């Protein structure tokens, strides 16, 4: 079973004291302010064999998301909606404690949070993925791979997922005596993405709240809270991780900070996606 670096790494006390001493001065090891995000870059259409893909680099954290569309049956409780299935894998090359094999509880949690943020925000209009109501719909497989774990992988997974969905091609559907089939030679459009969604994570280290923690900062954090936002700044997901606790005042302060960061992050995401 894999362990995330924040659970596995033990930074020597002297290094923690050094990091916290920088927080006292309002700065960090990489020169950022406490509320600054690391540099973000998004490369679209990175995996040519996928129907849509995006490579996200957030500092040293690197995540690849890819999509595949296939004709399928709708779920019984949502006969007039397409299906979205999110998977996350922590690849062994991403960090020394990650092991090969089926997704562990950390990967499953990441997938669940990303899935919930996409669904609750209605970022993807699943009703427009219906081919024949109650019988045939598009199933969107969204596979997310953590290639390099440099901290704050959840935010990067959300960014990569949204970018890959935005970049996903929809092919022509043809019908014959055997039913529906996909004509991969003809693209009819892209996935009906209503709007982007972003996740902003805030870590608490001693008395300090820091945005977008890197690997060292996650290794010494007490706890972390992540907020997912739509462009109108509606909260569509909250996730706490880490063994420590946050007071109501901490949570309120963290959300106020995350909201301000989300505005800038959404602008940057839209810019890089060209929307």
Swiss-Prot record:
Keyword Cytoplasm assigned: yes
One Gene Ontology MF term: mRNA 3'-UTR AU-rich region binding
First-listed, main subcellular location of the protein, grouped into a coarse class: cytoplasm
One Pfam family cited in the UniProt record for this chain: RNase_PH
Cellular localization per UniProt: Cytoplasm
Keyword Glycoprotein assigned: no
GO CC annotation, single: cytoplasmic exosome (RNase complex)
One of the protein's GO biological processes: rRNA catabolic process
SUPFAM superfamilies: Ribonuclease PH domain 2-like, Ribosomal protein S5 domain 2-like
Family to which the UniProt record says this protein belongs: Belongs to the RNase PH family. Rrp42 subfamily.
Function: Non-catalytic component of the exosome, which is a complex involved in RNA degradation. Contributes to the structuring of the Rrp41 active site.
PANTHER family cross-referenced by the UniProt entry: EXOSOME COMPLEX COMPONENT RRP42 (PTHR11097:SF8), EXOSOME COMPLEX EXONUCLEASE RIBOSOMAL RNA PROCESSING PROTEIN (PTHR11097)
Subunit structure as annotated in this protein's UniProt entry: Component of the archaeal exosome complex. Forms a hexameric ring-like arrangement composed of 3 Rrp41-Rrp42 heterodimers. The hexameric ring associates with a trimer of Rrp4 and/or Csl4 subunits.
Protein name as catalogued: Exosome complex component Rrp42
